[in-house]
Amino acid sequence: MDIKLVYSTLDPVGVTIKKLGYRFEEINEDVTDFHYENGEAIVIFSRHESKAGIPSLTVHYPGNPSEEIMGGEPKKLGIAYPRLLTSILREIKKIDLNIEKTMEATHHGPTYQNVPVIFVEVGSNETYWTNDTIVKALVDSTIRSIDKVDEIDCEYYISGFGGPHYSRLFTKLADESCIGHVISKHYIDKLDDKVIIQTITNSVNTINKVVIDSLNSKQKERIIASLKKLNNINIEFR
């Protein structure tokens, strides 16, 4: 598969990558609203921001689960590629740096692409975005992960609902299974049937399991009602 590695010249992590001498695809757009669509899959490196400023390496898919948008379109998810994201996450976990490595729930744009997009990010402030050692370790691990996409084991292909934005559960499940879209608890009450279905259908690999994390009975019932429209989906509650 033709997987394109991309950075933006408007992003500080992209600037660091360019300074380090990597020759990837270069865009001059906001990473949350870019229109680049070459190749069969896109991995875009970018900064991750958080008020806590905790150093972190994160991966996630783009998508806006509700009417609220940050780039892209409302109520539209990008295309997931569970094998690729999981391969990247597993390699990131091997990086020998005292830094948090985690999967984030699906959020922000872009949502225009007809190919999968995966964000690989450095957090959480300029100290880390411009740190050559951290950025190089992340980029090199991502390059290694691409060579392993077709080799990794996936017990299940999982989509998820619930839990916090930084998901320890799905980060852990990625040790054995491959992870698609994860919708955090913050969006659950804003979901409509269309978005719930997209968590299953918008995926390169066929999703065969849904994990529901710490939701109340009313929220579970609504998700299950939507999922019943699809066949052969195993549902697990945590």
From Swiss-Prot:
Family of this protein:
Belongs to the DtdA deacylase family.
Q: What is this protein called?
A: D-aminoacyl-tRNA deacylase
In terms of InterPro entries, this protein maps to: Deacylase_DtdA_archaea (IPR018033), DtdA (IPR007508)
What sort of enzyme, by top EC class, is this?
Answer: hydrolase
Question: Where does the record locate the signal sequence feature?
Answer: none
Instruction: List the keywords (alphabetical).
Output: Hydrolase, Metal-binding, Zinc
Known EC number: 3.1.1.96
One Gene Ontology BP term is:
D-amino acid catabolic process
Q: Which gene encodes it?
A: dtdA
Protein source organism: Saccharolobus solfataricus (strain ATCC 35092 / DSM 1617 / JCM 11322 / P2) (Sulfolobus solfataricus)
In terms of PANTHER family, this protein maps to: D-AMINOACYL-TRNA DEACYLASE (PTHR34667:SF1)
GO terms (molecular function) for this protein are: D-aminoacyl-tRNA deacylase activity; D-tyrosyl-tRNA(Tyr) deacylase activity; zinc ion binding
Please indicate if the UniProt record lists Metal-binding as a keyword: yes
What quaternary arrangement does the UniProt entry report? Monomer.
Its function, per the record, reads:
D-aminoacyl-tRNA deacylase with broad substrate specificity. By recycling D-aminoacyl-tRNA to D-amino acids and free tRNA molecules, this enzyme counteracts the toxicity associated with the formation of D-aminoacyl-tRNA entities in vivo. Catalyzes the hydrolysis of D-tyrosyl-tRNA(Tyr).
The UniProt note on the cofactor reads as follows: Binds 2 Zn(2+) ions per subunit.
Q: Which cofactor does it need?
A: Zn(2+)
* Catalyzed reactions per annotation: a D-aminoacyl-tRNA + H2O = a tRNA + a D-alpha-amino acid + H(+); glycyl-tRNA(Ala) + H2O = tRNA(Ala) + glycine + H(+); D-tyrosyl-tRNA(Tyr) + H2O = D-tyrosine + tRNA(Tyr)
